Amino acid sequence: MGFRHKDIIALKDLTKEEITLLLDTADSLSEINRRDIKKVPTLRGKTVINLFYEASTRTRTSFEIAAKRLSADAVNITASTSSVVKGETLSDTANNLLAMKPDIIVMRHAVSGAHEYLAKRVSCSVINAGDGAHEHPSQGLLDMLTMRQKFGKLDGLKVAIIGDITHSRVARSDIYGLTTMGSHVFLAGPPTMMPVGIERLGNVTVCKDMREAVDKADVVMMLRIQLERQGKTLLPSMREYSRYFGLNPEVLGLAKKNAIVMHPGPINRGVELASSVADCDQSAILAQVENGVAVRMAMLYHVCGGEPVE
């Protein structure tokens, strides 16, 4: 089966077969990242523009590395050093970039839906690197790849996602992707950070407290508080948040013995995650970062029309 989409905007738009194809391709391409010479000519002659309106370390760097390992030319643009600071609109930015004939625009934007707006106005492919509190599809894919590598499957897994669900685009992509693949997602967080009706997104259970969500979980995914997306104070204090929704060794002990701990980063140590847990043998956080390069290679490959990789 080939990949039928010009763009990758949201995991909500992808079928189980399409997600499996992307994960299988990422698994195959991950071998390149372990070579002495980490480069193949697959996308030679292609141009990838990384257009970031928000700060990023892991996502932007790994998209750039992914493009270069496939021999594409990667150009990085940040809003703070572009004509955006002079008042240029997204539409005008897109038209000017399109005039330079790129093959793919990878964009991160603070406004939910910005990528759909962009994709309708450009002929090249668009990949969503995060839009507001909507979705972060590459993070969702790399999270699923990390889980699949550990457990050999996604179907039937119990995945606990803890934290600021309302403002987290990672939570939404994980929920869409995992429920499509047959996992059961359990959510916990402060009531002020739990969107009403989120259980309607799929096989999702909203728990009254963190311990209920973590109990017998295969995966414990911790999320940071998205202070930059909150218009008002939603917590009495970080100390109180950590007391009720921070993952420490005692709470982790409620999960299955072979459970893994995950976090999309950046970590706020001592708030949502104790350092002793972040650095323990069950932590898969750095495996997530490593898998991010392979997943983004797969995304670039398939929007350029790549065939399934054996």
Swiss-Prot record:
Keyword annotations: Pyrimidine biosynthesis, Transferase
Protein name: Aspartate carbamoyltransferase catalytic subunit
Positions contributing to L-aspartate binding: 86, 169, 224
NCBIfam families listed in its UniProt record: asp_carb_tr, PRK00856.1
UniProt record similarity statement: Belongs to the aspartate/ornithine carbamoyltransferase superfamily. ATCase family.
Superkingdom: Bacteria
Function recorded in the entry: Catalyzes the condensation of carbamoyl phosphate and aspartate to form carbamoyl aspartate and inorganic phosphate, the committed step in the de novo pyrimidine nucleotide biosynthesis pathway.
Listed PROSITE patterns: CARBAMOYLTRANSFERASE
Pathway membership: Pyrimidine metabolism; UMP biosynthesis via de novo pathway; (S)-dihydroorotate from bicarbonate: step 2/3
MF annotations from Gene Ontology: amino acid binding; aspartate carbamoyltransferase activity
Pfam entry (one): OTCace
Gene3D superfamilies cross-referenced by the UniProt entry: Aspartate/ornithine carbamoyltransferase
Catalysis: reaction(s): carbamoyl phosphate + L-aspartate = N-carbamoyl-L-aspartate + phosphate + H(+)
Signal peptide range: none
Subunit structure: Heterododecamer (2C3:3R2) of six catalytic PyrB chains organized as two trimers (C3), and six regulatory PyrI chains organized as three dimers (R2).
Binding site for carbamoyl phosphate: 58-59, 108, 136, 139, 265-266
GO cellular component terms, A-Z: cytosol
One of the GO biological process terms: amino acid metabolic process
Entry EC no(s): 2.1.3.2
